[in-house]
Amino acid sequence: DAIDDMQEGLMPSLIEEAGELGLVGASVPEELGGMGLDFKSSMIITEGIGGGHSFAVSYTAHTGIATLPILYYGNEEQKKKYIPGLASGKLKGCYCLTEPSSGSDANSAKSRATLTNDGKHYILNGQKMWITTGGFADILVVFAKIDDDENLSAFILEKDWDGITMNPEEKKMGIKGSSTRQIFFNDVKVPVENLLYERGKGFKIAVNILNVG
């Protein structure tokens, strides 16, 4: 069908339509543009969408692991800037954790961020693998280590920033309509205000979000 044929723009438009129905922001507080439903209600919605195959994968990646890191761990400015767009479906998100050499051992990721001399930006370099919704995401939650830190930190990136590139879509056996990409970061300038939560707390964010998202 059109979804599995990866018709250009179809999946993002379906997420936007779900957003118009309030389904994308079901668990987001009303003051941030969502419906403010409880966890049980969100699960009922997700169960109903579960038969949607490729759409269900894209929907849950966007509403869960892409949106919840900012909703749960973002400061007030970050939430006001990004959550209303994510809750409406006008912005699409992705979660960038896995790397070629770090799958189940996610905290061994090699992506690195270095603070500039003026202290205004982090310069991010690295590669992420098998990123669901990566092909059409506007907002990327990216995990990388700052300098020589032992633990990951988390950052909020925007797709149109210089230095973000990606490979063509992965050729999958199933759920073909759900975008899956490799994403590369080459000297991406990330404003310091886009550090999510606290330095060195990215692994905590990553696993907690996977548990609930």
Go through the PLM ranges and name each one:
Residues 1-60, 77-88:
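Amphipathic, small/basic residue-rich leader segments at the start of a protein or domain
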Residues 22, 29, 45, 75, ...:
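Buried hydrophobic positions in well-ordered alpha/beta secondary-structure cores of metabolic enzymes
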Residues 36-46, 105-109, 184, 190:
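Structural signature of FAD isoalloxazine-binding scaffolds in flavoprotein oxidoreductases
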Residues 51-52, 164-213:
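Glycine-rich beta->alpha junctions and the first turn(s) of the following alpha-helix
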Residues 58-77, 103-106, 115:
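N-terminal glycine-rich flavin-associated loop
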Residues 89-97:
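A short, Trp-centered hydrophobic/proline-enriched beta-strand micro-motif
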Residues 102, 129-135, 175, 211-212:
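Glycine-rich phosphate/pyrophosphate-binding beta-alpha loops
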Residues 120-166:
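A short core secondary-structure module
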